[in-house]
A protein has these predicted regions:
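Long amphipathic alpha-helical coiled-coil segments
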Residues: 72-81, 100-104
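Non-catalytic, well-ordered alpha-helical scaffold segments
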Residues: 20, 24, 48-51, 66-69, ...
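Amphipathic, coiled-coil-like alpha-helical segments
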Residues: 2-33, 85-124
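Conserved catalytic segment of histidine kinase HATPase_c domains, centered on the N-box/ATP-lid region
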Residues: 39-43, 81-88
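Amphipathic alpha-helical interaction modules
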Residues: 29-67
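Short, glycine/alanine-rich amphipathic alpha-helical segment
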Residues: 55-58, 78-83
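Short, well-ordered alpha-helical segments
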Residues: 60-77, 91-94
């Protein structure tokens, strides 16, 4: 006896997988920003890159996974906030880690909630 995902579960997982790819790009920008901060270079150029990378993630996740979308929006707010660059980079790294963890947890939950046994579908 096997099992598979129902239609809505498959669609949700595709959305989450696409979001994970986009978050990896966002993580790359944050890590480049951290490297520049360590080398005492200006970080102004990264703010716009972060906003451009985060906007598609937030809009992708908003319809089905709004809490994660809010986390992405908060990351953008942190990137525009004043204060020390070191604290900003630290907060952004934490935000990216929280987003990744939330995406993983949500993917596991979707798999659990939308798994259908093959025998159930054959009887219908």
């Amino acid at each position: 006896m096997g099992s598979h995902l129902d239609g809505s579960g498959t669609a949700k997982l595709q959305t989450l997988e696409h979001a994970v790819t986009l978050v990896q790009k966002l993580n790359t920008i944050v890590e480049r920003m951290a490297q520049s901060q360590r080398m005492l270079q200006p970080l102004a150029q990264y703010r716009q890159q972060i906003q451009r990378a985060a906007a598609p993630i937030a809009s992708l996740l908003k319809p089905q996974f709004e809490p994660i979308s809010v986390m992405v929006t908060n990351l953008v707010i942190v990137s525009t906030r004043g204060g020390s660059d070191q604290q900003k980079v630290r907060s952004m790294r934490e935000s990216v880690a929280q987003i990744k963890a939330a995406l993983d947890a949500t993917a596991s939950r979707v798999r659990k909630e939308h798994t259908v046994a093959d025998s159930d579908e054959k009887e219908s």
